[in-house]
Amino acid sequence: MARIAGVDLPKRKRVEIGLTYIYGIGRSTSRQILNKLSIDYDTKVDQLTETEINAIRNAVTNEHKVEGELRTEVSMNIKRLMDLGCYRGLRHRKSLPCHGQRTSTNARTRKGPKRTAVKKKGAAKKK
């Protein structure tokens, strides 16, 4: 099993797909890496030689921010926005969408599950 950037790549998948298991590498980045190293996309991960695995490992770690390094950079960017107090930072702080989507009805993923309104016992009875 190939281990690149702290992630075990699945043996039976194609290399192009296997590389996308690494946080920060998608299909297009995976293809760029494989083109540069002249490795066929359709090669299975378990068919890679040690030299190919080392070449991929070097290309991923040296040229791209992946896994922990990328996660910390993203979280620091969000923290910076929150500290600045700009609109996007405020939206992050309130756990609301920051790209202009409507929140009256949608945005359940960001806002969390619905909280039902509970009536007070004293307010319900009027004489």
Swiss-Prot record:
It holds the Pfam family Ribosomal_S13. Keywords: Ribonucleoprotein, Ribosomal protein, RNA-binding, rRNA-binding, tRNA-binding. Signal peptide: none annotated. Residues 108-127 have a biased composition (Basic residues). InterPro entries: Rbsml_uS13_C, Ribosomal_uS13, Ribosomal_uS13-like_H2TH, Ribosomal_uS13_bac-type, Ribosomal_uS13_CS. One of its GO terms (cellular component) is small ribosomal subunit. One of its GO terms (biological process) is translation. Residues 96-127 are annotated as: Disordered. The keyword Ribosomal protein applies. GO terms for molecular function: rRNA binding; structural constituent of ribosome; tRNA binding. SUPFAM superfamilies: S13-like H2TH domain. The keyword Nucleus does not apply. Part of the 30S ribosomal subunit. Forms a loose heterodimer with protein S19. Forms two bridges to the 50S subunit in the 70S ribosome. Located at the top of the head of the 30S subunit, it contacts several helices of the 16S rRNA. In the 70S ribosome it contacts the 23S rRNA (bridge B1a) and protein L5 of the 50S subunit (bridge B1b), connecting the 2 subunits; these bridges are implicated in subunit movement. Contacts the tRNAs in the A and P-sites. Belongs to the universal ribosomal protein uS13 family. This is Small ribosomal subunit protein uS13. It comes from Desulfosudis oleivorans (strain DSM 6200 / JCM 39069 / Hxd3) (Desulfococcus oleovorans). The gene is rpsM.
